[in-house]
Structures are given as C-alpha cells and as structure tokens.
C-alpha cells in the first residue's frame, strides 16, 4: 500500500496484520478522485478518519496538503502502525497538522469536538451494524463536529449493508469496489 499523490507520493505504508481490513488502492484512489472533484484540492481541509486502521486515508490527505488530519483508532497494534506510517509521510514535511486519538470512536464522538471537519471517512469493522454507524453519524451531527456541507464517506461491506443516512445528512451516491461499497453523503444540518 502506497501514498498515491502529494509530497509523500510513492511512500510505502505498513499495514496491521489480521486486525484491520485496509481500503483497497482502487477504492482509495476513487475516494480521493471524488474528494478532489468536490473540493478542488486539500488546502485548508480538515479531515477526520474514524476507525483509522493503518492511517492510509488520513495520511494520503495529509500528503495532498490537508491542513488538519485527525485519526481515531482504539487498537494498540493499529495505533503503532499509524504512528510509524506518519513518521514515513512526515519525512516529506507535509504542511498540515496531524493527531492520533487513541480511543474508541464511540468515546471520541461522545466528547466535545476537537475541531469542525470538512471531510469525515468512516470505515468500521464489517461486523459493525449499520445502526451503529448511523448512531455515530447522529453524534457527529448533534455534537457539532461538522462544517456545513461537509462530505462524509462511509465504507461498508457490499454483501449485506442496508445503510441509510440519518437526519442531518443527504445521500449523494454510492460506489462498489469489490467487497466494499463507499456511501457518500453531505451534511445538511437544515434537514435535521
């Protein structure tokens, strides 16, 4: 797995053996293509990566110039991998700020927000119920974590997901990438 673009382009990232299911390079490339079409570039962007795994999504955004990247991951082995991957990406001196929150996503979204985010990427373990993901989204909405018109991307298994957006969000599109589907939605607080 490599950083696709930006100042750390080509850097090989470590993965967590067995504990996580990394987003495929194809899906990651498509995700960032969608984000670029939405935002133009990553300058000034604040991104939140929930269930960070290897940190590839957040670190890709950092490499591309995001101003602030926060990753939330509770697994200790994954945290070490994210820290090691950050050190690799940081050798190229990306301009943005980075912070790893070593806690559960449920705890993170129950605490006061650390920032307001333009982009949130949520990639929970496949055994997470859709209702649990919808609860996290509701807490992002009611907790004040999101900038108006924030873009949310939720990765779920293509096999059994009945994912739907809760109040405060509008579905934009969904795309299948092998075993995964990424659902895109906009934060629309006036609708919730």
Describe these PLM feature segments.
Residues 1-192:
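Class I S-adenosyl-L-methionine-dependent methyltransferase catalytic core
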